[in-house]
Each structure stands twice: as structure tokens, then as C-alpha cells.
């Protein structure tokens, strides 16, 4: 369970460094951290300086909080996220979302790099998350509930806000960006899925599978933050193509689509 005292300690540290008051948060997935470099007047705070923050060891993830502005909006960006497969607790994985809420964030964009399960999709596509499937039997809200942070029994019928999704769709159409829509399945990792597991995941109704996003989205929902999720489909999931999977492929594909990704996210933020 997240402790209010810990959240406030982290908040006080950030506010002692910058007077920028962010209303929009973004969590940047593997290979997508370059968006943070587009923020104007940015302040960079290493995770190691923030109390109660973990540090990601995943390739493609820096470890700093970047606070600045874009499109006339103040933004706090996580340049690097924490993954459950790294051995962090779900409290550690999701603590940054609690900090964002304390800093004043009202809307959150969660991004990730993941594998395409839907065979109509292709590597390099962007996918707007419409819903998710939690395959892990874990939930960041397990344990005592602090009513100051959110309700005990959370309605998750609309984790990914419809109004915000409509904005993203409108931006993609205006910019002639191909934007898929689909269901994201959370897989703990760090192993990729087996071909049999991918067949199961497809049967369950997922269009993409990855190792993040769902814990943060659930805590954002619990905190009352309107959330939207955007996936960069960096590879076809295991067994679809006759080739092995690698994290290098994930980073390489994310690099190729970063300009399109930045354009979509920047314009979306300006319309929030």
C-alpha cells in the first residue's frame, strides 16, 4: 500500500526543484523516451534523487523525471518506467502515478512497446488501448486500502477514458496516422510468450501483449486520473512469424516510429 507520507515526501522534493505545476502526465515505454526531449523549459530530476523511487535497469529506459511544457500544457514525463519483471513490487511500479496525482496531474498518457497478437496489425503500428486483460493474477490494489487515495472496490469498466480516446483518434485522422485500436494483455515477463500462450491470448480477445501499463492504469483509475494508453507494436508476437524475438528488435522498431509517435502525442496533449 502506498503511504501518504512517502508520496508527500517525493512531492516536496520535486516542488523544491521546480515551480512548474504539471496537469498532464506521460509514462514513456521502451525506446519512446525521446518525447521527453521535446519539452520546453524542461527540468530533469534523476530518479535516484527522488525519495521512494526505484530505478529501472531495462534497456531503452532512462531514469529521470522530466517536467516542462508542450502545446501550452505543463507536463511531467517518466523517461523510463519500472517493470514488475525487474523484481519491483507493484507498489514500486506504480508509485510514480501517485506522485503525479500529488503534483496536480489530471490526465495521463501511458505508452508502451509491445507485441502484436492481432495478425491484421504490423510492426511499427500504433495502437490505442480500448481495454486490457490482466493475465498475471496480480493487482496493485491488493492489500489495505487508504480511502484518502481511492475507493476499496474500484469500477474498471472504463479504465481508458472514452473522451480522451476520441481526442487521440481525431488527432490521428487529422495527421493521417494509421492508428489501430485494440485490447492490451499484461504479461509479467521477462520471458516472451510461447506460441501456445499467444494462441490462448488471441482466443481471450487480446490484440497486443506486453509487460507493463496495466498496473499504472489501475492506480491512475484508483486515483481519479483520466487515462489513455498508446502502444507501439514493435514486433509480431511469438509464433506468428518464423523468427525469434529480441529486445533489440523492440528498440529498433520504436526508434523508426518515434517521429510519428511524438507528433501524435504532442498534438494530443495540446488538445487536452
Regions flagged by a language model, labelled:
Residues 106, 207, 226:
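Short acidic/polar active-site loop segments enriched in Thr and Asp
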Residues 1-156:
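Metabolite-binding pocket within alpha/beta catalytic cores that recognizes anionic/polar moieties
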Residues 211-249:
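Zn-dependent metallopeptidase/amidohydrolase metal-coordination segment
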